[in-house]
Amino acid sequence: MFTGTSSLKPPQTIWFSSKSIHNSRNGRLNDLHVRRGEGRAANRSAWMGAPPQHQVHEAPTGLHPKKAKTQDPRQSPLKTIWACAEELQPVFSEIDRLIAANVARTQRAFATARIGPHHFLGSTGYGHGDLGRGALDQIMADVMGMEAAAVRIQFVSGTHAIACALFGVLRPGDELLSVAGSPYDTLEEVIGVRGTPGSGSLAEHGVGYRVLPLAPGSGAIDWGALATAVKPETRMALLQRSCGYADRPTLSLEDIRRAVQVIKAQSPRVVVAVDNCYGEFTDTAEPGAVGADLCMGSLIKNPGGTLVPGGGYVAGKRHLVDAALARLTAPGIGSEAGAVNGETLRLMFQGLYAAPQTTGEALKGGRLAAAVMQGAGYGVTPASGACRPWSAITAIRLGSPHAMAAFASAVQASSPIGSYVTPTPGVTPGYADPVVFADGTFVAGSTSELGADGPIRPPYTIYCQGGTHWTLWVHVLQSVLTALAQLE
């Protein structure tokens, strides 16, 4: 259930589900047909469409921020935000140097592949012989420091790319070891920790699973436990580079290097795979440069440069990439098929080239959000200031579901798309807890554009990402501070 207003008419409240649209202003069905799936979160469903069978409902219940108060313009938080930005200029300068280094290595990869306009032609049908697709794979492999890569619009998400790698490599009797605590929520059903029986999880295919808990207190990898963690049946060790929805630091490349060494010392046959979502271009190298065998990610996150309309990638040793592609397509087809139209293919090239810059701006925006929210008395991870490793996700502990709703609503209202929609926590595929999402983005789910989301569970943390320029967060944070002040 969401509330929203149309900019074309006087303000009015609309409550709706997939079964009803109710206009509280005049009790009639409104001509603005905004709808959603049952129990789904705002930005994960269709907003516009023909109305279904109409039935008027009472106002929904749920988690909503308190009613807005009139804000005295003299109390605007803008001055505080700009003061934080001024103090962060040395940090921003460091990030600019990171951007420059990553632009250089990306351009070298493009030059090595000799990219020209003929690579943007695209393909149809089976997609056999697509020169552009093959060249893009070469660039991604180079950027990731890997032997091979597959960049495909056919991956529907980062979770899908990771799942293809897991199912491509693991066989009945093998064990998957999650090295840095539990993985991201959406992988739990892939693994079989929860979910609908009969969905074909790894567990249902006879693959074992074990979690290595994080070290108490620090939230870091438990190096002592990892030193003896590999068993004869352990076939893959999975490292999640970002914090995801966990209360822990981002893994550094040095963490990944050390983990590879510790794991391989016990068994060289273990495949070390890295969930690289939100990790691309946050350092001057990628997991392949420190010995990882595989890494996977989403094109609507960092490496798509906010331009790519969908897709994901797998990069690693050639036989492992081939195994993942056999899962994406079919054995015997693998990398030889997968049509993509020319316009989308050009955006995949252009987005990858833009990614160092857009990721750097997101890092700056995260540092600004951390400084402002820490100054307002909230706990943040990473803490304000320069951080190593750089993190594309800034976690802000708000302390209550109402504060999460207020924060998300302020972000959504400050966004270019769907600013009239108030996000409400709801059930979203892949997540065990209700999740609130605010990402009024041009590409659905492209949190690299700018977004904030989080599961409704203690300590009620919202996770901020993206921003094509850091000043977008100046505008957003002004709304956020105002909204949170109105809850007091």
What role is predicted for each listed range?
Residues 74-89, 96, 106-112, 116-119, ...:
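Conserved PLP-enzyme active-site core in the AAT-like
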Residues 374-488:
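Conserved C-terminal alpha-helix-loop-beta "cap" of PLP-dependent enzymes
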Residues 10, 54:
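Cationic, low-complexity basic patches in intrinsically disordered or flexible, solvent-exposed regions
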Residues 58-113, 374, 385, 389-393, ...:
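N-terminal glycine-rich, Lys/His-bearing helix-loop that initiates the first secondary-structure elements
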Residues 1-8, 16:
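N-terminal chloroplast transit peptides
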Residues 8, 29-32, 63:
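Leucine-biased recognition of intrinsically disordered, low-complexity hydrophobic segments
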